[in-house]
Every structure is written in C-alpha cells, then in structure tokens.
Amino acid sequence: VGVVAGTLNTLVGGGTLLVLPLLVSLGIDPLVANGTNRICVAFQALVAGWTMNRGLERSRGSKAQEMPTIGWRPLMLVGGAAILGALAAIEIEHLDKALFRQVMGWLLLVAVGAFLWPRPDPPLADPLTDPLAATPGIKFYIGGLICGFYGGFIGAGVGALIVLLLTTSMRLPVVEAVRWKVWWVVAMSTASGFLYLSQDVFDRAVAIPLIPSYGLGAYLG
C-alpha cells in the first residue's frame, strides 16, 4: 500500500486517501496516524522532487531551468499555513477526540469526491508572451493558504488541489504544476511534521516500514 500511495502522491496526489483510513482501521489513533503520515509524506516528496529534477536535467540539459516558474517564496507561505493546520488538528483532538474523528471522516469523504470529480483542462499561457500568466495574484495566495492549512491538518488529496491551483491561477502546464506540487508538499509536510514530532504525535513502528515504501513509490512515480 505504501508503494502505491507513494506513486499516487508523486503523480497526481491522493495516496493519503489509501493510507490514512488503513492506519485508523488498524487501531491507530487518528491524530497519531495523521502525524505519522505527514512525516512519511515529507520524505516521499523529497525523493520525488529529487527524481523529477534529475529527470529534467537529463532530458533538457541546461534548459531545465527555463520552464515557467512560480518561485520559491510561496513555499514559506504554505509551510507556515501547514503549521497552523497541524496546530488546529492537535487542539481539536485534545478538546474532543470524537469531533476530530468526525471531522477527519468528512474531510476524507470530501477529498475522495473532489479527487474523482472530472475537471476540464485549464487554458495554458506562454509566460514569454503573457507576463501576467505567471504572476501570482491574490487568488493564488489565498489558494496557497488554504492548501497549506489543509495539508498540515490532514492533507488527503492536497496534491491534486495544488495542481488545480497552479494550472488555473498560474496557468502552468500540468507537468510543471506537478513538479512544483512536489516541493509544496515537501514544505508543508516538513513544517507540520516537525510540529507533530515535537508533540510526540508519531508512531515509529508505523513509520519504519512506511517511509521506505513511500520512497520507493516516489522513485517509481
């Protein structure tokens, strides 16, 4: 399951929709399962980012960096929002465990529906002829905050949301959006993962097999 989830996370997102319900069904506390998964996803996304960048360098050589880009500053935005999302998850679970289970369940259902809902192909733009196409606007930053918060809170299907944001608000090609999606997931999962670790919301017995299987899936993806 970890290999399949890692591959899905790399290509389109949604691997957490497989892993998180499985961990909860095995009797692991939902918050612990969520925190453990966030930490494992950070490692998976790092492997995916390294693999994608290496592939771009091999296929395009020195032109790999000439693709349309959104810059690295939004990573700080989604990372900070992810910390807030993780804090919200921890606080809700501490206040009412049953409420957190209900919120997680409904979010997973919504994420599955959104993941399967057909979406039309967004119009693409050439950033060389249309400078505004690759210029972040207010909708982009609001969307980034929402993605970051949700990524730290649960994160199921957040990769697909990020790709949707980048292809609509920035009008990036899907391939380029997927590449940037990976680094957004690295930022939000690493930031929220450190918080979960600091609060001891982490199961080492689960992470030991999950991290390498996630990494293998990311490499294959």
Question: Locations of the language-model features?
Answer:
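Hydrophobic alpha-helical transmembrane segments of multi-pass integral membrane proteins
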Residues: 176-192
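Transmembrane alpha-helical segments of major facilitator superfamily
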Residues: 40, 180-184, 209-210, 214
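Transmembrane alpha-helices of multi-pass small-molecule transport proteins
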Residues: 36-54
